[in-house]
A protein has these predicted regions:
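Hydrophobic transmembrane alpha-helices and their membrane-interface boundaries in multi-pass
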Residues: 3-82, 92-95, 114-116
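Short, highly charged, low-complexity non-transmembrane loops/tails of multi-pass membrane proteins
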Residues: 167-171
Length: 171
């Protein structure tokens, strides 16, 4: 789990900072985005520092962390995707986190759910901008993004499984 905090959290922060700095959304969107990011960051740090204190609940805490990250990704995607197209990359964080300690079928379902949330938010965004159901090209783009999310998640799960096998073979 700490690996994700070292790589994915800074990536998410950089992605959001670039989205805000280079696209300059409204002040309300900017403040709300920073508020969500700050609250999620603080909660993730607190959970990671206290996971060993609640060792019996560590499995549940990790699952909550995955769903919390997905909710934060969805909120930030909704707020900033109109300004910064790469915001969809936030949907990689929850399935990648689940790949570290969940079974492959759970990772797959997490990735599918993440994709479903992304599709839903694309649709809601399309309705909000009066574009109806978006165009075929945009749905194809979203489909490509969804396929990447699933494949990347399964790749991460396979890598995590391989690391454990190598570790166990050295004992």
């Amino acid at each position: 789990m700490h690996i994700l905090n070292y790589y994915f959290t800074p990536f998410a922060v950089i992605l959001i900072l670039f989205a805000i700095f280079f696209s300059q959304p409204e002040k309300g969107v900017t403040y709300l985005s920073f508020g969500i990011l700050g609250a999620a960051f603080a909660l993730n740090i607190w959970l990671n520092r206290n996971i060993y204190r609640f060792l019996r609940w560590s499995r549940h805490i990790r699952a909550v962390t995955v769903w919390l990250n997905l909710a934060v990704s969805a909120a930030l995607f909704y707020l900033l995707s109109a300004y910064w197209a790469p915001m969809w990359l936030l949907f990689l964080t929850a399935p990648a986190a689940s790949a570290m300690y969940m079974k492959k079928w759970q990772v797959f379902l997490t990735a599918l759910f993440s994709c479903a949330v992304m599709f839903s938010l694309y649709y809601v965004r399309g309705l909000a901008f009066g574009e109806g159901g978006l165009g075929t090209q945009l749905w194809a783009m979203a489909g490509t993004q969804a396929v990447f999310i699933v494949f990347f998640s399964m790749f991460t799960a396979a890598m995590a499984e391989m690391v454990i096998k190598v570790r166990d073979s050295m004992r």
